[in-house]
C-alpha cells in the first residue's frame, strides 16, 4: 500500500471503520460494501465469504478442564492466568502442583524445620527468608529476662490467705464464750476420708492447683518459716494453715456440705500431738490402715474406728438427744464442748429425723434397753416404747388383752353388704310372736279352751315353744297327725268334746288363748289345698309341720289320730 503524504486528507469508511484517502475513498467504499462484512460478535471486518468460518472457529463455546465454558479465542488467556487447575511451583520445595492445592501444601511444607548454621536453632522453612534478620537475637532476649522467684508468685496468694484466716478468726471469736480451736496435726486430717478425697471425687474444679496439694503447701510453709522472725512464725499457727487449706479444697462446694463436713471434723485437743507437724508425718498418713464404718461405710483410721462407731451407732442417737449425759459424767475439754456447740448450730438432721426437740439434760437418769429392738431408752419412756415397739411379737399382747372384754360380749357390727333381707311369707310368724306367748303364759288364762278347738292346735303350739324358746313347765302334749276329712267332722268334734277337751283345756288354756288372739280363723292360708283323699298315713310327719295359721284354718275338718311315741315327736321337733 502506498504511503500517503501528510498533507493529503483521509476519510473514515462506515463499513470497515478504517481511514481511507480522499482520492480513493469512492472506489474503496464501493468495494468494501460489496465484499467485506462486520462480525456481529467481535465487530471485526472480515470477508463475507469467510464469515461463517470465522464464527465457527473463533466464537464457538468450549469447556475448560475446570468445567468453565468460554469462547475458543479466550481459552488460551484463561488457562494461563485464571484457571484454578493450572500448574504452579511450591516456593519451599519447587514442586509443581495445581493452584487449588498449593495453599495447603505450602502450609504443610513450610512447617518443616531446618537447622540454622549461625545460631544453631531449628527454624521453620517458611521463616528461612526472614530468619537472618533476627538470627541470634532471641537467645539474648531470653538471657536478659530475669527469672521470677517462687516467692513472687506466692505474694498475691499470701495476701488472700491472711484475709481468709482473719475472717475465720473473727467469726470464731464472735462466739459466746470465745474459745480457741484446739490444734490438730495435718496428718490426722489427711487420714480423714472427707478431706482425703480428691477434687474429681467431690466434683469440684480446682481453682488453685498449687494450694490444693497439701505436700506442697507444707513445704512452702517450712520455707517461709525459715525466712520469718520467731514472732511472726508463732502467730501463724499450724491450725490456721490447715483451715486455709480446707477453705481451698472445699472451693465450689455447697455451703451446707462444707460447713457440715468441716465442723464434724473439728478434733479434740491432743497436747501430745499439738507440736509442729513434719513433712514425714504427712507422707506417713498415706500408709495408715483405713477401715470402713459398719454404719455409715466411711473410711477411718484403725485407732479411731471404735470411737467413731460408738458415736455413729443409730441406737445411741435417741440416748444422746434425750439424756445429753450418761449416768457416769466425765469432764469435757473445751474442744469437745466447742465441737458439740457447732454441731448443734449447723445441723438439726437427727432432731428432724427422730421427731424430737432438744431438751435439757436429765441428771442421774437410768438407761434400759428395749427387750424387743434393743434401743436404749430412759426408764420413764421405756414402758411406752415397748408397748408400741414395731418388733414386738404377737404373743406379747395376751397379757395386755386380759382386762379387755372379749368380742362376744361386745355388740356385733354387721356389715351392710353381708346382711341379707329375709323374705317374709304370709304364713310366717312375726318377730314378737314368742314374746307375746310368754307374756300370756305368765299372766294366766282368762278364758277356758273353746269347745270348737281341736287337739291339733295344742300340739302345734307346744312344738313351736319347744323349738324356738325355753321349755315351759307345762306338760308337752304328744304330737298328733292331721288328716283332712270333711265327711266326719261333726263326729270327731263330738268325741273330742266328750273325752279329751276337759283335761287338755285346763292344762293349755293360756297357750291356746294366745294363739287364738294372734291368728284369727278367717286368715287365708298361703299354700294350696288338696283333696281329702290324697293324704295318707305315710305323710303324717309332713302334715304335722303345718303352721299355726293353717292348723287354725283347718281345725274344723281335722281328724286327730292317736299320739305317736315320744321319740318320734322329738325327732320332728328337731327338724323344726
Curated annotation (Swiss-Prot):
GO cellular component terms listed in the entry, alphabetical order: mitochondrion
Annotated keywords: Acetylation, Metal-binding, Phosphoprotein, Zinc, Zinc-finger
UniProt feature, compositional bias: Polar residues: 540-552
Protein name per Swiss-Prot or TrEMBL: TRAF-type zinc finger domain-containing protein 1
Pfam families, alphabetized: TRAFD1-XIAF1_ZnF (PF21366)
Protein purpose: Negative feedback regulator that controls excessive innate immune responses. Regulates both Toll-like receptor 4 (TLR4) and DDX58/RIG1-like helicases (RLH) pathways. May inhibit the LTR pathway by direct interaction with TRAF6 and attenuation of NF-kappa-B activation. May negatively regulate the RLH pathway downstream from MAVS and upstream of NF-kappa-B and IRF3.
Organism: Rattus norvegicus
Zinc finger (TRAF-type): 27-103
Residue positions where Phosphoserine is found in the record: 278, 320, 326-327, 409, 415, 430, 450, 531
Sequence positions bearing N-acetylalanine: 2
